[in-house]
Each structure stands twice: as C-alpha cells, then as structure tokens.
C-alpha cells in the first residue's frame, strides 16, 4: 500500500513528506535545521524545552516543531525574528539556572547546551547565576550526577522509564524547585538502578557522567611494583574512533592497540579471546541442559545490566541464567591464573584493566561472587570507551596518525564469533556456530545465522537439528527483555536458548560508548553503523568459530582441561543471587 504524502511549505519552499511526520522532520528533509534540546526520537517527544518553536501560519502562538504534525497546505517559518527572539530568551532562561563551569566540565567538547548557545548567537547571559554550587551525588560505582548542570529536559527519565522500564529517576518537587532524582531523593545506590548508563548517553549536558576511574589506572601505570594488563571489549574497536572525530563505524583496532602500548600498559590482550572462552563454556552448559533435562531456556549472562535487572526484578528466573562469568570477568580470571602461571608472577602483582562499552561493568568488577580461589578479584578497574579516549588525548597521542599494532598473542588471538559479541544477536550467533557444529558434525553447520541479526528489539528463530528443534530468542533493551520474560513465565513463549542485553542494540550502544549529539541520534542509525563494522571484521577473520581459536585450544589443553571441567567452573563460572530492592 502506497504511503500517503502531505504537501506543505517551509520558509516558502515546497516540501512533501509522509503523513504523520513532524514539522521538525519535514524541515530537516528540506535542508532546514531546527534546534532542539529535549527531543530524542521515539524516546522523549514532549515539546517541553521550547527551543524548537516555529511559526505556523494561522496558529495563535509558536508551536513546538518536534511534536507538531504536518498538515496539507501548512505554511511554516523557522527563522523569523519572532522565532529567533523566542529561542534566545528561552535559552537564556535555561542558562540562568545552569552552573556554567564549561572550561572544566566533562562535556566541554560535546555539550549540546554549549553548542546551542553558539548556534543561537547568545553572546551574553543577562540572568546568570554565578553563585550556583555543585550538587553532586556519587553514591553509585558507575555514575556521577550534578543537578546544578541539569536543564530538566527529561531525556534521562524518559530512557529510564520507556526504554529500560526501570524508572528509578524522575522529576521531584514542582515549579522552580523541580529537580531530577530518585524517589524521596534517595541516593542512586539505594534504589533499583541497573547501572546501564543509558541516562548518561541521553543527557545533553554534564549533569550525568560515568564515574571517572582513570586516576586509578594512571597510578597503577606509574607503580613499578605493578604489572598492568589491559584488554578491550569487542565493540570498543568500532566506537573508539568517534572520540577523535572519525566516522561512526570505523574500525580502529590497530591504532587502539598502539595507543594502549604508548600509554604504558605492560601487556595488551584482547577480551575477544575471553569471548571465545565464553562460547565454549556457555555452549557446553546449553548442550548439557538440552540433552540432560536441565532448566530451559538457558539465558545468557554476558550483560551485567541485565544480570542486575534479573536479580532485582525477576529473581524467580535465576535458575534459567547461565553460570558463566561475562567475557570481562573471564578475561581477568585467565590473566590472574593462566597468564600469571605462564609468566611466573604473583597474581597480586598484576593489575587488570578492562576497556568496556558499559558502565555496569564498574559494578560487576566489585561483585564478591566473582572472586577467584586465589583471593584475587579478576578485574581491578573497568574503564569506559570515553575514559580511554580521554586518556589518549591527555597523553598527547595523535590517534589518527598512530601506526597499527597487534595484541600480545598469549591472550590476544580471537575469532569472528567473538567480534560480533558487541552487537545484539552476536552472542547467540557465536554460540550457534559452535553448538550446531557439535550437534551436526564438522563442516555440516552453516557459518552465519542472520535471523538473529539486526536492531529489532526482539528476534526469534528456530533450527532443525538431528533429533530436536532448537528455538532461540534475542532481546535487547530492558523494555523488550521484560516482554520476553513475561511470555516465558506465562508459557506463551517457548524457547531453548535466549540472549538478553540490557542496552538497545547490545554493547555497541552501551552506556559507556561515545556520546553522539541528539541531531545525529535522531536522524542516523548509529547502532546499525557500529554493528555493520563488527560484521565486516567477522567476515575478514581467519577463524570464525570460537572452538577454532588456537589459543583457546591451547589453554584448555594445558590448563583448564575441557569446557565445563571442574577447574573451568572454579575460574570461569559464578553464581547470581536475589538482590534486595528498595520498596517505596
């Protein structure tokens, strides 16, 4: 059926757009940029900030273009004197309630409010509040909130409520006393936050940021008694370049490795290698449950945001989750056991740093359930992509001009299956590549499972295997995870294997990834561009199934025994428990 179109005029230019489009979308298609602040497409469409106002012929007042629908014959004006003065006054009033320490703010190079001030010609703030003190709340291990920089756009509350259905933050009080916080102004550490960090990447200012752990890493690098090992997650190599202005989806693996060496890390390993171990362990666990009558569906445990959601909001499903540690934790476990043994080092002298797309990893590294038999915690510090970007900049490295380097081979060889872990469906596809081949025989299984790829919130597929049908599901974003969980509970959804990721689109869209301007987010499929880069990497890999990785084979032969062995369970598995929820 043909889509119905609507014709209108914008600044006297004829424009034709699909029915249901907003004035903002129509203007964009015609080459007119309408500034906005509170608008995030499909997430926060409330027209509250009034920055995006335009004139519509016949309307009594200016209208918010982000929510105002087009109509046949409409005449719109986006740059009249009335519009410009309204936007400037609105922005001045917003700035009057904003602590402007722009020189030292964590968002000083990519603040939407700062950019708006320049774009709208604000050369003086007539109503500045020069004495506004910081309002810091830093109780959680992953996030710092400073409400003195909050502009009440409600983008953070919308993503927490709608995308994640966690809803731990919202507006408190009324009028001039309105502020964003938790119920009864509780600290974030006291409520049911899952640490996903989606609120941070939604925030247009410096009101929300990850807790910066770079000082701890620099201290370790400067400590001659510490042997400092680093490992980046699969998605980092296709997002780090954005910190330096490279196009979205640029793979910078080689430059990233060189940068890490020049920062002073003693060994640069790859968490992709640990992802291959994850598939061997999780695949073995799945086959054991499938063939031995264990609890199904088996649900993946790679996403700490999802795991925390499970423990707080769905503890009745704890028996379904895999006991495997995440790739980050497996990486640290192998470094402080296998690598320490091979290098003849005391594990206590090894300082492990992970580079992750995820703020929830900062919470995960603190979990006592992860502690190794030798008394060590697997990972000492988890940094986000953004933190690594800042370290590279502060070290004076010209990232774009760095030569390509290679990972240290002992724990630095990986497969295409590990590379795609960073995209929603990647863990499932990686597992299927190994599990299906084990069930059907070498050379009989397909290499790609495109049914589980893509940015849809929920994906389903079934595969006919010898003697059984395997039904799988992939869901990302906790709103979609909740839907699938409800279906599993009531029996309307029947699966054998399920992949859950807390962040929409998976790790490529994690809360620790580079923050893109709302104009980019609203009109570009960032998740798809980043994921496509991972699939391109997969296609070019020598090994594309996790069990083909020669490093994995060697570590099992020389150290772990076999997948699912007693030693593997002691080092690469853990338990998850019901967590206390704050009740209001």
Task: List PLM regions with ranges.
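Structural motif corresponding to the C-terminal cap of alpha-helices
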Residues: 164, 203, 339-343
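Phosphate/diphosphate-binding loops
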Residues: 197-212, 261
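Terminal leader/tail segments of proteins
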Residues: 1-3
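Mobile "lid/hinge" segments at catalytic clefts and subdomain interfaces of large enzymes
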Residues: 167, 200, 388-392
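Fe-S ferredoxin-like electron-transfer domains
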Residues: 50-195, 208-223, 227
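Iron-sulfur-associated redox domains of electron-transfer enzymes in respiratory
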Residues: 7, 14-83, 210-584
């Amino acid at each position: 059926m043909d889509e119905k179109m609507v014709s209108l005029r914008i600044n006297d230019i004829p424009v034709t757009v699909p029915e249901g489009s907003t004035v903002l979308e129509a203007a964009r298609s015609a080459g007119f940029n309408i500034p906005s602040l509170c608008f995030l497409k499909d997430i926060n469409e409330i027209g509250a900030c009034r920055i995006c106002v335009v004139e519509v012929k016949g309307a009594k007042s200016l209208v918010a273009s982000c929510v105002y629908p087009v109509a046949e014959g409409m005449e719109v004006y986006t740059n009249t004197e009335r519009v410009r003065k309204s936007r400037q006054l609105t922005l001045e009033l917003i700035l009057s309630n904003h602590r402007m320490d722009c020189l030292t703010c964590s968002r000083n190079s990519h603040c939407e409010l700062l950019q708006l001030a320049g774009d709208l010609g604000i050369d003086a703030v007539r109503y500045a509040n020069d004495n506004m003190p910081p309002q810091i709340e830093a109780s959680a291990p992953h996030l710092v909130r400073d409400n003195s920089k909050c502009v009440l756009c409600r983008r953070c509350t919308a993503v927490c409520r709608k995308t994640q259905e966690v809803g731990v933050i919202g507006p408190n009080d009324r009028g001039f006393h309105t502020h964003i916080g938790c119920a009864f102004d509780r600290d974030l550490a006291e409520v049911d936050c899952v640490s996903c960090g989606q609120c941070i990447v939604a925030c247009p200012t410096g009101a929300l940021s990850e807790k910066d752990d770079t000082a701890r890493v620099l201290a370790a690098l400067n400590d001659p008694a510490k042997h400092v090992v680093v490992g980046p997650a699969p998605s980092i190599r296709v997002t780090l370049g954005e910190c330096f202005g490279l196009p979205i989806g640029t793979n910078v693996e080689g430059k990233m490795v060189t940068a890490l060496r020049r920062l002073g890390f003693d060994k640069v390993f790859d968490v992709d290698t640990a992802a291959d171990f994850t598939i061997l362990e999780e695949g073995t666990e799945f086959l054991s449950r499938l063939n031995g009558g264990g609890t199904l569906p088996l649900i993946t445990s790679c996403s700490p945001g999802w795991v925390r959601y499970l423990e707080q909001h769905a503890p009745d499903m704890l028996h379904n989750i895999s006991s495997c540690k995440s790739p980050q934790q497996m990486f640290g476990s192998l470094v402080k056991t296998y690598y320490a043994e091979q290098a003849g080092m005391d594990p206590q002298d090894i300082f492990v740093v992970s580079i992750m797309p995820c703020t929830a990893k900062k919470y995960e590294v603190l979990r006592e359930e992860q502690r190794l038999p030798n008394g060590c915690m697997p990972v000492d510090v988890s940094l986000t992509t953004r933190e690594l970007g800042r370290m590279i900049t502060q070290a004076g490295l010209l990232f774009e001009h760095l030569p390509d380097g290679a990972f240290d081979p002992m724990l630095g060889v990986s497969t295409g299956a590990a590379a795609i872990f960073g995209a929603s469906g990647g863990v499932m596809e990686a597992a299927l590549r190994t599990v299906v081949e084990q069930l059907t025989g070498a050379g009989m299984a397909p290499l790609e499972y495109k049914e589980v790829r893509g940015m849809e919130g929920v994906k389903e597929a079934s595969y006919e295997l010898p003697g059984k049908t395997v039904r799988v599901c992939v869901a990302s974003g906790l709103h979609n995870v909740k839907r699938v969980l409800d279906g599993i509970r009531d029996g309307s959804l029947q699966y054998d294997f399920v992949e859950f990721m807390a962040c929409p689109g998976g790790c490529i869209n994690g809360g620790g990834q580079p923050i893109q301007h709302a104009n980019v987010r609203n009109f570009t499929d960032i998740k798809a561009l980043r994921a496509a880069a991972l699939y391109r990497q997969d296609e070019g890999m020598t090994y594309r199934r996790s069990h083909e990785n020669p490093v994995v084979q060697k570590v099992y032969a020389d150290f772990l025994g076999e997948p699912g062995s007693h030693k593997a369970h002691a080092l690469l598995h853990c338990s998850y428990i019901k967590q206390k929820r704050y009740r209001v």
